[in-house]
């Protein structure tokens, strides 16, 4: 939870303002309202030949668990730019976005996930490990490591991918 004002450094207090319908963190000194809102995480499902590339996380949180390449969007990026950059940083794969795959959010979560379907720019390229990836493998719809996925959002995204590939009745 945020404790101090980003404008003046004074302590924040929870208040119900006349213009708001919920408690907000307000600075008693300068009146700044500190909104606590989710951040955008952009990622791709790099797909080739009916298989999706996933990485085993090399960093916390959830180090050692599988996810698709993704990360926080920087202020000077679009969601597409961030998704492409994160995929290159984490897997070494140069991708082109095919289309928006989905937007995933949950109440109480600090992130909104924006996920794109992507294809390799160079289909002969192979992924390379990074400080964020312990392992990078491609999985078919019947091979997804469901018990070892990093986040609830990872599971939702991959369930939707399996439904796209196999049809809705095939979702695990």
Predicted segments, located by residue:
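Acidic, metal-coordinating catalytic segment for phosphate/diphosphate chemistry
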Residues: 2-44
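Conserved hydrophobic "DFG−1" position in protein kinase catalytic cores
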Residues: 46-47, 54, 118, 138
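Conserved Nudix-box catalytic region and its N-terminal flanking loop in Nudix hydrolases
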Residues: 47-89
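Conserved beta-strand and immediately adjacent loop positions that scaffold enzyme active sites
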Residues: 43, 51, 135
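Unchanged
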Residues: 73-96, 100-160, 164-172
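Active-site donor-binding loop signature of nucleotide-sugar glycosyltransferases
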Residues: 29, 57, 70, 118, ...
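A short beta-loop-beta micro-motif enriched in histidine and acidic residues
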Residues: 40, 61, 132
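Short glycine/serine/proline-enriched coil/turn segments at secondary-structure junctions
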Residues: 36, 62, 107-110
């Amino acid at each position: 939870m945020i404790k101090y004002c980003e404008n003046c450094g004074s302590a924040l207090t929870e208040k119900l303002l006349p213009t708001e319908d919920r408690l907000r963190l307000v600075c008693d000194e300068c009146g700044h309202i500190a909104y606590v809102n989710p951040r955008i995480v952009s990622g791709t499902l790099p797909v080739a030949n009916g298989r999706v590339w996933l990485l085993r996380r090399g960093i916390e949180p959830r180090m050692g668990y599988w996810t698709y390449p993704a990360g926080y969007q920087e202020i000077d990026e679009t969601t597409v730019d961030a998704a492409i950059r994160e995929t290159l940083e984490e897997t070494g794969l140069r991708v082109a976005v095919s289309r928006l795959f989905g937007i995933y959010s949950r109440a109480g979560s600090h992130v909104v996930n924006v996920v794109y379907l992507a294809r390799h720019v160079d289909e002969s390229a192979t992924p390379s490990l990074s400080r964020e990836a312990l392992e990078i493998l491609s999985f078919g719809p019947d091979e997804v490591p469901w018990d070892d996925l990093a986040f609830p959002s990872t599971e939702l995204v991959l369930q939707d991918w399996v439904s796209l590939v196999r049809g809705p009745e095939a979702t695990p």
